[in-house]
Amino acid sequence: MEFLKSGIKTVLGSTEPGQQPSAAETVEKLVDRVYSSTLLEDRRDACRALKALSRKYRIEVGAQGMPPLVQVLQNDGQDAEIISYALDTLCNVVTSEEFDEEADNPTVSVNVGEQFTEMFIKTPEHVTLVMGYLDEYDFRVRRAAIQLITSLISNKTRELQDLILVSPMGVSKLMDLLTDSREVIRNDVLLLLIELTKGNSNIQKIVAFENAFDRLFEIVREEGCSDGGIVVEDCLILLLNLLKNNSSNQQFFKEGSYIQRLSPMFELSQDAEEVGWSPQKVSNFHCLLQVVRALVTPSNQQQVVAACQRVMQKSRLLHALCEILMSSGVPADILTETINAVAEVVRGDRDNQDELGRVMAPSSPPRPAIVVLLMSMINEKQLLALRCAVLYCFECFLYRNADGQRAVVQTLLPSSASDVSALSTGQLLCTGLFSTDALANWFSAVALMHSLVENVALKEELLRVLLATPGGQKPITLLEQCTNLMQQERYRLQSKVGLLMLLSLWLAHCPGAVKALLETQGTMAYLTAQLCSNEHDEREFLVQGMCAFLMGLCIQFNDNSLPGQKREDISQLIIKRIGQESFCSKLAEVSRHEAYSRACKQAQIRAKSAGELLLDFEYCKLYKGLEALIAKLVSGFDVDGIELTELTLSSEASALVSQYKGIIRGMDAQIQALQQSSKELEQENAELKEKLGEEQSLKAQLLDQNTLLKAQLGASTGQVQSAQGAEATPPNEEELNAARYQANMYFAENIRLTKELETLRQQLSAEKQSADAAQDSLAAMQKDQEDLLELLADQEAKLTRYEEAGSTNTLPTSNVAPSVPAAGGGSPIPSGTASR
């Protein structure tokens, strides 16, 4: 510290005894020295002093010293030492971290670095100036420039990304630094690129096309792959930034055979269990698994996901992940993330699902991996994150896998019990469903629910499942046991939510299940009591909403085969005991709950605590599709619920009704034709949109390649012009001509694609107009049909009133009507017959 003080005195000169200048005065003198000194040595000493003061007096140095430091960068580029001082000082001023020297300075705010960053980048040329010093090979200058740009990006990411994009060869300069032989420079550039590529797809594409994947894999290999240090982690984080939510880079990664280069990194050594997992290896493996998931996450384009899943199976990456699943000594967080990765690799791919189904755990006796995972899921001693991951993996294993769903249900049927002592998926799910652990109840109910998704035949099969009862009594069905558990007071709310989800998905589109539920004793009374209760707890509101939804399913999918439990009977029960408005209000409580908004976002189950596990993605999808229909159905019933039939009408009224029905049938035929036409137009519209998306993606790739070619062309032109008048050698001229020709070809292709894109847009617009016209016509026809139905109802009501009035007026007089002599002296004819 004394050396620092003596250095500053050397620059500023000695002061009078007893007069200690303030920090602001000291900085002001140093700034004046930088501005006014003609000797380079004096300016260099002043910059060195400013750098020393910038850690403790950041505000003073930043407020006064930024303009002279920029001036140094502009004018003294030939001296590497003064440039390094200027860059280091600016880096200290704009950094977001707090220095130990300024910890006791109350004037330094938390975001002071961000404020100085904003001041610095107000002039875009400042960033270009700093970028220029990346070409300087001197270690101090290059590293200081990299660190300054990194600090600027971390403070103002979006603004710096835009400035670097327009900077000449900006991204290319940064990518070239990855090949620097000095590891410190290379590692700092990795940190810079991590900040630069966050959330900017254009920069991500440029970095990827600058051969980033090859360079990153080379660095990872040199550093020891997953057993390497923190540099490996930085490379994988950058790789993750390039792939996440970027379909172009994902396609490029797949087509470049980089997935095959990931597979060896997941192979564990023979002595891995003995050596153990270091904290850095855990971090590296976690990043590797996130890279895999970035390629196959369900939010990606479906064709990209399917292609990556096939490659992962062929390259044995899935096999390596399954080996990790079954290995011992794997840390819990790595095991959890591996289960999530396996889940997304197999989701919707039958070959991958079959391979996972064939994996056997190294136990005695050997058991399928799925069974071992389910054992962990229903074990309350396991970590919550691990149990959630197992459920997600089981859901993905059953997703669009009818054979897998059937295998689960078959293990519950009596005829499938070939080995009573062997554990099966069905037995484990029933064990969890009837456990005393509420979380195990919820997990098992959701898992069993997913074995029924979009499979009505299995819903019918599951009705045949019988459960033994204590005391040798008559066995009861699984559905009956679920309703019994739901009605028990000791059954916790989370368990009830799981059962309500299972029953709702079971009943949807399955009249047989609805009939079985209505036949169970006390179920409808319990649901009615739940809806009539006045609870004020948010979770009780959710249960009431789910009970209303289950009751609505009993109306919607009721085949009217049970006397006293028909659609009209249940509707009258709702109207008289609950009320239509109250029922619809409680039905809507599900969508108002925060658990609904969480579950709707994604299929993966995420929860910080066990209490957050309430609703599942598939249940929310079912509720979203049927809620409005059920509300409309219940609201449409009258209090009396009496419907007129054609048998109660006269011949004239029946003829009128038949006429109206004929009109309605004709309108129905027209509506169906319009709906079919609308579906065809929508399908054609979807195909055009898909084709348009492909063209836009191709255009984006061509634009990226065009940008690179422009950059290469500019670099080639600069090399030719800097040849100091010497004639260009034939190879350079040929390369330049080839580059120009290729650029022209890309320009022409770009123009062609633009025209084709415009044509597709016009076609899409025309199809949309046609679809809108069809929709308008359909709406008009539906309105006419509704008007006719209302008119028909009015006519029927009038006819009924007329018939009642007529019967009241004519019946008494017909009993006393006199006889009229018939012509020719025949027998008398009653007046009623004569009138007819």
UniProtKB/Swiss-Prot annotation:
Gene ablation phenotype (knockout): RNAi-mediated knockdown results in a loss of Golgi stacks and affects the organization of the transitional ER (tER) sites. Golgi stacks break down and form clusters of vesicles and tubules. The Golgi stacks that are present have an adherent morphology, including a decrease in stack diameter and total cisternae (stacked and single). The tER sites lose their organization and become dispersed throughout the cytoplasm. However, the efficiency of anterograde intracellular transport is not affected.
A GO BP annotation: male germ-line stem cell population maintenance
Alphabetical list of Pfam families matching this protein: Arm_vescicular, Uso1_p115_C, Uso1_p115_head
Any Gene Ontology CC annotation: Golgi membrane
Compositionally biased intervals (Polar residues): 12-22, 806-816
Record flagged with keyword Coiled coil: yes
Ranges occupied by ARM repeats: 24-64, 65-124, 126-166, 169-210, 211-256, 316-359, 368-413, 424-463, 477-518, 523-577, 579-636
Topology in membrane: Peripheral membrane protein
Keywords annotated in UniProt: Coiled coil, Cytoplasm, Endoplasmic reticulum, Golgi apparatus, Membrane, Repeat
Residue numbers spanned by region Disordered: 1-22, 803-836
Residue ranges with Low complexity bias: 817-836
Source taxon at top rank: Eukaryota
Subcellular location, principal: cytoplasm
Subcellular location: Cytoplasm; Golgi apparatus, Golgi stack; Golgi apparatus, Golgi stack membrane; Endoplasmic reticulum
Coiled coil: 663-707, 744-806
Known function: Essential for maintaining the architecture of the Golgi stacks and for normal organization of the transitional endoplasmic reticulum (tER). Required for both the formation of the Golgi stacks and the maintenance of the individual cisternae.
Family in the record: Belongs to the VDP/USO1/EDE1 family.
Protein name as it appears in the record: General vesicular transport factor p115
Organism: Drosophila melanogaster
Protein encoded by which gene: p115
